[in-house]
Regions:
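Short, flexible segments with low predicted structural confidence
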Residues: 4-5, 73-75, 137, 145
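A cross-family glycoside hydrolase active-site/sugar-binding cleft signature
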Residues: 1-4, 42-44, 83-87, 114-116, ...
């Protein structure tokens, strides 16, 4: 949502005015998600949360949470859940472990995390164990291979991942999230 535009937004910026604009934008996105009938809003956006000097990643994570507070208040009315997406491309919340720690710290009923297979593989090759460990916190799943392609177009074995999700009783959405549409955007969904 914040990855490429609008320009000038950052949830952990040292400038309070930038954080306020970002907070206002997140509130607007919650209302937009409600209008669409969405149940969740995934907050990935590594460029909009990476630590900016002189802040450390830990300090930035705390600022990021403060920036989320107004949106979480609106979530109490709309029922939208905000999901922190762990991303190794940033230095703020790279792993499920870190995301769950922040979710536990905030202890808000509308703040959870999600599982992105590609990103989780950077944390551990044993994704099923992480699913079992963090199941109560996972409210959405992105299915993508470590090579950025769709399941079946790389070396990741999705069978144990899907079995673990079933074992823990996961009933939420799972979306395909390839970044490389090999062999082509029009043919990859029709193959395999």
């Amino acid at each position: 949502m914040l990855l490429w535009s609008p320009e000038g937004l950052h949830g952990a910026h040292p400038d309070r005015a930038v954080r306020q604009r970002t907070a206002d934008y997140l509130v607007a996105l919650v209302h937009f998600a409600e209008a669409l009938g969405a149940g969740v809003m995934i907050l990935g956006s590594p460029k909009a949360r990476t630590a900016i000097s002189p802040l450390t990643p830990a300090e930035s994570a705390q600022m990021w949470l403060e920036t989320l507070e107004p949106a979480l208040k609106v979530c109490e009315v709309t029922g939208i859940q905000i999901l922190l997406e762990p991303l190794p491309e940033t230095d703020v919340v790279q792993t499920l472990r870190e995301a769950v720690a922040l979710v536990e710290q905030v202890n808000h009923p509308f703040l959870r995390t999600m599982l992105d297979v590609k990103s989780t593989l950077a944390e551990s090759p044993d994704v099923p164990t992480l699913i079992r460990r963090y199941a109560p916190y996972i409210a959405h799943v992105h299915l993508n291979d470590a090579n950025l392609r769709a399941p079946g177009y790389g070396t990741t074995d999705f069978s144990p991942i899907l079995q673990a999700l079933q074992l823990v009783g996961y009933t939420g959405w799972a979306s395909l999230k390839p970044f490389d549409y090999f062999p082509s955007p029009t043919t990859f969904p029709l193959q395999k």
